[in-house]
């Protein structure tokens, strides 16, 4: 049972409120918070949510990953603030944890893209 300092649960570190929201969107009426510890549920919810965020932010991976970590509300605020956004693109992330998270995800993405270049075409 993996729980972050912030209370995110399971393999894909989903916050309980987000889990309930996802369950509602997926029509999972009997969802319980403890199901976030079940890998099959957690991965399905996390993948669905990441796809939702990618769709919400026009396929921009950096922005979607930032929203996965910091929440879409925070990211929308940053996108509307010239201190953090240039030309509708997230230029600077004010939360250090989120900025580091986005960098780690991008490094992993680049690494796996190279590693599986032949399979990905």
Segments predicted by a language model, with ranges:
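Catalytic glycan-binding domains that act on GlcNAc-containing polysaccharides
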Residues: 1-121
């Amino acid at each position: 049972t993996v729980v972050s300092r912030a209370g995110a649960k399971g393999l894909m570190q989903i916050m309980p409120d987000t889990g309930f929201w996802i369950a509602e969107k997926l029509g999972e009426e009997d969802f319980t918070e403890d199901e976030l510890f079940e890998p099959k549920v957690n991965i399905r919810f996390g993948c669905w949510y990441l796809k939702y965020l990618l769709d919400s932010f026009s396929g921009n991976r950096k922005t979607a990953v930032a929203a996965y970590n910091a929440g879409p509300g925070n990211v929308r605020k940053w996108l509307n603030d010239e201190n953090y956004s240039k030309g509708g693109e997230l230029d600077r992330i004010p939360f250090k944890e989120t900025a580091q998270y986005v960098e780690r995800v991008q490094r992993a993405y680049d690494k796996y893209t190279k590693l599986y270049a032949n399979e990905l075409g």
